[in-house]
């Protein structure tokens, strides 16, 4: 599972998910990517499930890049506990994803294989996603 090695503070505010992603909106490492169309918290378990679905379908062929990292802790209080008496204990880790963010990239496989692998991965995630290709820009030195 993905999680930070160490953090400065154990608990964090929930925050707000406004607007579109600032960076990481283009495919850089592979040839194909999976882009978020909605904003959400994506847990480390969901990221791992999507990664497994992709690698299992590609049968160890090609390479997978994970472009999101779960660096935000979320807390939960135990069941049947009354309100109040402080914030709950850290429960897990989430990555904050905004629309436009490329979450996964795939390289070294054909477009059909990449499309199906990323489709399987998108079913493991709680948001709508779309398949994107690397933009070929000419004239770069």
From Swiss-Prot:
Q: Which GO terms describe its molecular function?
A: rRNA binding; structural constituent of ribosome; tRNA binding
Q: Which UniProt keywords apply?
A: Ribonucleoprotein, Ribosomal protein, RNA-binding, rRNA-binding, tRNA-binding
Q: A single Pfam family, by name?
A: Ribosomal_L16
SUPFAM superfamilies tied to this protein: Ribosomal protein L16p/L10e (SSF54686)
Top-level taxon of origin: Bacteria
Record-linked InterPro entries: Ribosomal_uL16, Ribosomal_uL16_bact-type, Ribosomal_uL16_CS, Ribosomal_uL16_dom, Ribosomal_uL16_sf
Q: Can you supply one Gene Ontology CC term for this chain's record?
A: cytosolic large ribosomal subunit
Name one process (GO BP) from the record: translation
What does this gene product do? Binds 23S rRNA and is also seen to make contacts with the A and possibly P site tRNAs.
Task: Provide the assembly information.
Answer: Part of the 50S ribosomal subunit.
Family to which the UniProt record says this protein belongs: Belongs to the universal ribosomal protein uL16 family.
Q: Which PANTHER family match?
A: 50S/60S RIBOSOMAL PROTEIN L16 (PTHR12220), LARGE RIBOSOMAL SUBUNIT PROTEIN UL16M (PTHR12220:SF13)
Q: Which NCBIfam families match?
A: rplP_bact (TIGR01164)
The protein in question is named Large ribosomal subunit protein uL16
* Provenance organism: Geobacillus kaustophilus (strain HTA426)
* Encoding gene (name): rplP
């Amino acid at each position: 599972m993905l999680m930070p090695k160490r953090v400065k503070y154990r608990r964090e505010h929930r925050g707000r998910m406004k607007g579109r992603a600032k960076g990481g909106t283009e495919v850089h490492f592979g040839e194909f990517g999976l882009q978020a169309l909605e904003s959400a918290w994506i847990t480390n378990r969901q990221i791992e499930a999507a990664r497994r679905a992709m690698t299992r379908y590609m049968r160890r062929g090609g390479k997978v890049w994970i472009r999101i990292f779960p660096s935000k802790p979320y807390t939960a209080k135990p069941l049947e506990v009354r309100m109040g008496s402080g914030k709950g204990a850290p429960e897990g880790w989430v990555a904050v994803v905004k629309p436009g963010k490329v979450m996964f990239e795939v390289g070294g496989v054909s477009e059909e294989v990449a499309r199906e692998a990323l489709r399987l991965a998108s079913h493991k995630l709680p948001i709508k996603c779309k398949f994107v290709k690397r933009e070929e820009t000419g004239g770069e030195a």
